[in-house]
Amino acid sequence: MSVRIEHDTFGEIEVPADKYWGAQTERSKRNFPVGKERMPIEVVYGFAQLKRAAALANFDLGKLSEAKKDAIVYACDQILSGELDEHFPLVVWQTGSGTQSNMNVNEVVSYVANMYLKDHQIDESIHPNDDVNKSQSSNDTFPTAMHVALYQEVETKLEPALKLLRNTLKEKEDKFDSIIKIGRTHLQDATPIKLGQEISGWRYMLDRCEIMLSESKKHILNLAIGGTAVGTGINAHPEFGDKVAHYISENTGYPFVSSENKFHALTAHDEVVQLHGTLKALAGDLMKIANDVRWLASGPRAGLAEISIPENEPGSSIMPGKVNPTQCEMLTMVAVQVMGNDTVVGFASSQGNFELNVYKPVIMHNTLQSIYLLADGMETFNNNCAVGIEPIEENIDNYLNQSLMLVTALNPHIGYEKAAQIAKKAHKEGLTLKESAIQTGYVTEEQFEAWIKPEDMVDPH
């Protein structure tokens, strides 16, 4: 392997000649061969947005020449294009401030920017610390890149997937509004409900999650940049943070602002905890929806079988013809993982000692993973399951007509105790509810027909 020699304050080190990173990235690669979880590329793109904006801000403030500004902006745009992904090899499990990833970006930007200057025959050079990282510290850049990445992924990936599934459930809710089925509480028969009403509960869960997500993501718009090492802003111009936030907003289209309290921004990540709490709430709702779907689709002959779901693949390697609710199982596993991630994010956020929280990479990793899993999970569940849900009306009608809980409609006419006697007699003697009611003498056949109407029970008002 061909190498070149790079150096840092620790001395010289060999770096692969075809890679754009420098000495500090190479040391991190060697010092932290831990796990396979690479720093998400979205974080790198968040850094690129930041470094680009910082160059523009430093130029405005007279801290950087126009040539250096142009070179850094060019390098950052190259990163944002996705052309340089291979030059960001570091894992999540590194220093808790994310310093190595910050330097990885600084070194790659410096390398590409210097090529730009050379190509344009400009007699200047870019230093990763003195120029790319000017007016910055890893302590304020990593949380800034984290917020930029999280906000963008919620906007571009999670919210569209949430809307997609919500809209499908709304279509099913409207389509099945005339189908009356038995309701169930405590896993036992209850009073009737429309299939559309049942699905409306699922849909409304997603409506509420969409609102909660919209509210919680607003706090992610606050950026730590300008706080530098401990929140005081040492080595940065007083206007630097606001200018960087402005340029990030200009390039992304999102209204980022510089946090009004940088001490908080460096040592606490409660804004991410709140965001992930919403992800956990969404995971809980998806768990409930997926469980309901697979129970209602259980069978085909010895289960509830009130709905059918698409048959996407063989379900068993030993039982021919078996088809399993695999999309539901996928979504419930996603939900469990997100709930686990929430525990990590909450605990990691609590570990801000004095002026800095040093669990930033794991907070970032787990939150992004939750966003990816929920977004991909909802889209896949929607396309391969939800869109194909159909009622099995014969079974639905059979369960409804056999239910003893229709007796609830008699309460206002004969009282709770007599209605309970009718239900118990029917269950004990294997009678229909109508047969039991007439045999007790509490109601006539005409009264039973007038009072026991499932269509009235689902819309009592």
UniProtKB/Swiss-Prot annotation:
Pathway assigned to this chain's UniProt record: Carbohydrate metabolism; tricarboxylic acid cycle; (S)-malate from fumarate: step 1/1
One GO CC term on file: cytoplasm
Site location (Important for catalytic activity): 329
Keywords attached to this entry: Cytoplasm, Lyase, Tricarboxylic acid cycle
GO biological process assignments: fumarate metabolic process; malate metabolic process; tricarboxylic acid cycle
Positions contributing to substrate binding: 97-99, 127-130, 137-139, 185, 317, 322-324
Broadest EC class assigned to this enzyme: lyase
Catalyzed reactions per annotation: (S)-malate = fumarate + H2O
Domain of life: Bacteria
Active-site residues, Swiss-Prot/TrEMBL: 186, 316
Enzyme Commission number, as recorded: 4.2.1.2
One Pfam match: FumaraseC_C
GO function terms (MF aspect): fumarate hydratase activity
Subcellular location: Cytoplasm
Function: Involved in the TCA cycle. Catalyzes the stereospecific interconversion of fumarate to L-malate.
Remarks, miscellaneous: There are 2 substrate-binding sites: the catalytic A site, and the non-catalytic B site that may play a role in the transfer of substrate or product between the active site and the solvent. Alternatively, the B site may bind allosteric effectors.
Quaternary context: Homotetramer.
PANTHER family tied to this protein: ASPARTATEAMMONIA/ARGININOSUCCINATE/ADENYLOSUCCINATE LYASE (PTHR11444), FUMARATE HYDRATASE, MITOCHONDRIAL (PTHR11444:SF1)
Similarity comment: Belongs to the class-II fumarase/aspartase family. Fumarase subfamily.
HAMAP family from the UniProt entry: FumaraseC
Full protein name: Fumarate hydratase class II
